[in-house]
């Protein structure tokens, strides 16, 4: 199902004029070529040999000023003119991550410079532990459509937007909140009319945290431990709603 969803995403975005460098997670996409690493093609699957030839794992984890190409792709998508945050406040994160098929993916995020070093360290610790993260693409790949990227189980950080089902800005709008493995760790809230708002809408089954399934975040999970030890709070502990994918900086 997730592979089908990704094919649909790719088709939609190609029709929208957004070029996906190579975001397929199949083994056919695996390569020992250094080009994907040199060009930092997020979503590409690479071999350990390619990583070694590129310069090693250390070279693949870094925080840098937003590159021109990334900044251009963010315009009108994750970034909109606003009084709260600008380009100089943000950093582009390069990282590697493992999936459940034991393959290495190239990943990237944009975050606030305040959390950049901490986020790089956490992602490196997750990589070293072979913690599975299915996708780590910029939300701009999905035209900053939060529902679409969450259905695709994408992990991300910065997006200038409001809180789901609310009118105030999300911590994602400042780049100080990170969502991990979003399909399996949904957001849900009981609305004033008694109805249940779930995001992504396809994740209703994963609101039940009493059963085990891949990518599940709970108090025993390494992702929870690393983020909370680094000064983040987990949305799964909130009382008025639950946001199991969400870690935000405690201010």
Annotate each PLM feature.
Residues 1-9:
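Bacterial N-terminal signal peptides that target proteins for export
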Residues 9-18:
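Bacterial N-terminal signal peptides
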Residues 20-22:
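C-terminal motif of bacterial Sec signal peptides marking the signal peptidase cleavage site
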Residues 25:
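Short, conserved catalytic or interaction motifs in soluble domains
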Residues 29-103:
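N-terminal module-boundary/linker segments of secreted carbohydrate-active enzymes
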Residues 36-43, 162-169, 174-251:
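Catalytic cores and adjacent binding grooves of peptidoglycan-active enzymes
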Residues 85-150:
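Active-site acidic/histidine clusters and adjacent loop/turn architecture
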Residues 145-173:
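Active-site-adjacent substructure of cysteine-protease-like catalytic cores
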């Amino acid at each position: 199902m997730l592979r089908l969803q990704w094919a649909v995403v790719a088709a939609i975005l190609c029709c929208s004029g957004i070029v996906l460098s190579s975001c397929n997670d199949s083994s056919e996409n695996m390569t020992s070529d250094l080009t994907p690493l040199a060009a930092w093609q997020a979503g590409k699957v690479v071999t350990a040999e390619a990583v070694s030839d590129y310069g090693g794992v250390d070279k693949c984890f870094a925080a840098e000023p937003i590159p021109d190409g990334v900044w251009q792709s963010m315009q009108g998508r994750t970034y909109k003119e606003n009084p709260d945050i600008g380009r100089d406040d943000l950093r582009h994160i390069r990282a590697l991550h493992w999936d459940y098929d034991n393959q290495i993916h190239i990943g990237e995020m944009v975050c606030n410079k305040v959390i950049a070093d901490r986020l790089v360290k956490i992602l490196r610790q997750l990589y070293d532990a072979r913690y599975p993260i299915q996708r780590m693409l910029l939300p701009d790949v999905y035209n900053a459509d939060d529902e679409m990227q969450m259905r695709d189980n994408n992990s991300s950080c910065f997006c200038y937007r409001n809180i789901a089902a609310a009118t105030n800005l999300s911590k994602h709008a400042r780049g100080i909140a990170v969502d991990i493995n979003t399909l399996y760790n949904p957001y849900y809230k009981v609305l004033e009319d008694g109805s249940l708002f779930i995001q992504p809408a396809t994740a209703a089954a994963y609101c039940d945290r009493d059963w085990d399934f891949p990518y599940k975040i709970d108090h025993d999970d390494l992702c929870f431990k690393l983020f909370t030890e680094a000064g983040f709070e987990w949305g799964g502990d909130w009382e008025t709603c639950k946001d199991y994918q969400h870690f935000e900086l405690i201010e």
